[in-house]
C-alpha cells in the first residue's frame, strides 16, 4: 500500500470528503447508506469497528415510554454529523416499551435485514453502534405515553428519507412527527451549506438542548 495511506490524518480527510459526498448522494433519494458507500471504496481493515457500549455495563434507571435515547455512533457518518451539527450526539431513538426495553428509530443500516427504514431495536442492538448514550425524559402523562407508543409502532417499516420538508423521514424528523401531536416541541431546524449537502435539517442537538424534559442518564466511552 502506498505510504501516504498510512497517515491517519490523510485517511480521515479522504473519508470525510467521501462521507460528505455520500450524504449528498443519499439526500438525492439514494437507497444506499453512507457506511455502505464508504465501505465500497476502502478495505474493512481500514474501517474496523471501534469499541462500543454493552447493556451489561450500563447502570440504567427504569425507563419509560417516550424517553428520548441519544447515541453517538461508531461510524464515520456519525463523526461527520457531529462536526456539521456541532454536537456530541448524532442519532436519536424513542422508547416505546419499558419491559422489554424497545427503541424505535429511523436508521440506514443498524440492522442489515431492515435497512433504510424505521425499525424497532432491543437495547443490545441499539448499543451495538453506540460509543455514547444519553437519555432524556419528557413530561408525559400515562395516556400520552400509550398513544405515542401506538402511533410510533404504526410507522415501523416506513422508508428512511434524507430530504427537506414533509418528505423527510430520518431519525429526528421521525421522533418529531410522533411526539408533536402530544407535546409542544418548538424545534428549530439548522441550515446546512456544504458542497454536496445543503438545506434545513433537524439534528439531535436540538432535542438534547431544548428546555423541555430532563437528562436522566448519560454514559460515554
Spans of model-derived segments:
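Short secondary-structure transition/capping segments
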Residues: 116-117, 146-153, 205-216
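N-terminal Lys/Arg-rich, disordered targeting/topogenic segments
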Residues: 1-6
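Active-site nucleophile-His-acid catalytic modules used for acyl/amide transfer and hydrolysis
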Residues: 77-78, 130-192
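Short amphipathic alpha-helical segments, especially helix-boundary/capping motifs
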Residues: 66-69, 124-126, 148-153
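Glycine-rich catalytic cores of cysteine/serine-nucleophile enzymes that process amide/ester linkages
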Residues: 71-134, 160-169
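N-terminal accessory segments that precede or flank the first globular/catalytic domain
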Residues: 20-96
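Activation targets extended, charge/polar-rich intrinsically disordered C-terminal tails
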Residues: 7-14, 20-35, 162-221
Amino acid at each position: 500500500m502506498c505510504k501516504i495511506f498510512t497517515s491517519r490524518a490523510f485517511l480521515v480527510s479522504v473519508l470525510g470528503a467521501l462521507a460528505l459526498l455520500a450524504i449528498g448522494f443519499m439526500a438525492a433519494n439514494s437507497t444506499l447508506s453512507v457506511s455502505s458507500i464508504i465501505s465500497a471504496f476502502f478495505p474493512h481493515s481500514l474501517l474496523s469497528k471501534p469499541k462500543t457500549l454493552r447493556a451489561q455495563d450500563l447502570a440504567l434507571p427504569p425507563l419509560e415510554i417516550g424517553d428520548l435515547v441519544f447515541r453517538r455512533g461508531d461510524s464515520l457518518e456519525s463523526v461527520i454529523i457531529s462536526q456539521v451539527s456541532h454536537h456530541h450526539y448524532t442519532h436519536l431513538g424513542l422508547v416505546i416499551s419499558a419491559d422489554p426495553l424497545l427503541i424505535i428509530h429511523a436508521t440506514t443500516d443498524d440492522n442489515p435485514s431492515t435497512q433504510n427504514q424505521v425499525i424497532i431495536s432491543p437495547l443490545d442492538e441499539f448499543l451495538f453502534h453506540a460509543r455514547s448514550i444519553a437519555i432524556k425524559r419528557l413530561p408525559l402523562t400515562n395516556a400520552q405515553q400509550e398513544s405515542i407508543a401506538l402511533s410510533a409502532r404504526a410507522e415501523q417499516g416506513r422508508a428512511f428519507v434524507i430530504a427537506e420538508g414533509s418528505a423527510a423521514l430520518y431519525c429526528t424528523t421521525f421522533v418529531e412527527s410522533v411526539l408533536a401531536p402530544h407535546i409542544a416541541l418548538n424545534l428549530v431546524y439548522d441550515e446546512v451549506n456544504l458542497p454536496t449537502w445543503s438545506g434545513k435539517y433537524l439534528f439531535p442537538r436540538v432535542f438534547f438542548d431544548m428546555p423541555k424534559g430532563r437528562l436522566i442518564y448519560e454514559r460515554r466511552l
